[in-house]
Amino acid sequence: MSALGFPKTPSDKKALEEGAVFSPRFDPAGLVTVVVTDAEDGMLLMVAHMNAQALALTLETGIAHYWSRSRNALWKKGETSGNFQHVVEMRTDCDQDALWLRVKVLGHDATCHTGRRSCFYRTVGLVDGKGTLVDDGSKPLFDAEFTYRKPSS
């Protein structure tokens, strides 16, 4: 567990938006949204969430940690797949309620649990009044079924 804490969000809007103190604004669930892009080419890789512990561990280790809302657990990105995200730069938006990580992905250079480089591999369209998804043709860079298989009992 990290010992790093974050100061309370300042009530002064100018201090929040222009000041030099990082005081992330966590939502009522204790999370902040994180947008992740490739540090070299800018490709959008994923959107995730961090709680205070994940954020502190990311700052302290330089490896991205997130909070899994579906598993309700801390998640070190790449721990199972080997596709760790080395943080090159972290930015916050004007009111400090969202973060942007620029990362170098290690391992297979894949970010998505499907084995693809990006979680954004489908385009959204509208055909005959219905939402459609079209795969962009990107192929998995590793065998996700093998990598994430459950051990047999």
From Swiss-Prot:
**Is Transferase found in the keyword set?**
no
The reaction(s) annotated as catalysed by this protein in its Swiss-Prot or TrEMBL entry are:
1-(5-phospho-beta-D-ribosyl)-5'-AMP + H2O = 1-(5-phospho-beta-D-ribosyl)-5-[(5-phospho-beta-D-ribosylamino)methylideneamino]imidazole-4-carboxamide
Q: Which residues bind Zn(2+)?
A: C94, C112, C119
Give the EC class as a word.
hydrolase
- Provide the E.C. number(s) assigned to this enzyme: 3.5.4.19
* Residues reported to bind Mg(2+): D93, D95, D97
Q: Which SUPFAM superfamilies match?
A: HisI-like (SSF141734)
- Record's keyword terms, sorted: Amino-acid biosynthesis, Cytoplasm, Histidine biosynthesis, Hydrolase, Magnesium, Metal-binding, Zinc
Q: Which domain of life is it from?
A: Bacteria
Q: Which GO terms describe its biological process?
A: L-histidine biosynthetic process
* Gene Ontology annotations for the cellular component aspect, listed alphabetically: cytoplasm
Q: How is the cofactor bound?
A: Binds 1 Mg(2+) ion per subunit. Binds 1 zinc ion per subunit.
Where does it localize? Cytoplasm
Pathway linked to the protein: Amino-acid biosynthesis; L-histidine biosynthesis; L-histidine from 5-phospho-alpha-D-ribose 1-diphosphate: step 3/9
Assembly notes: Homodimer.
Q: Give the protein's recorded name.
A: Phosphoribosyl-AMP cyclohydrolase
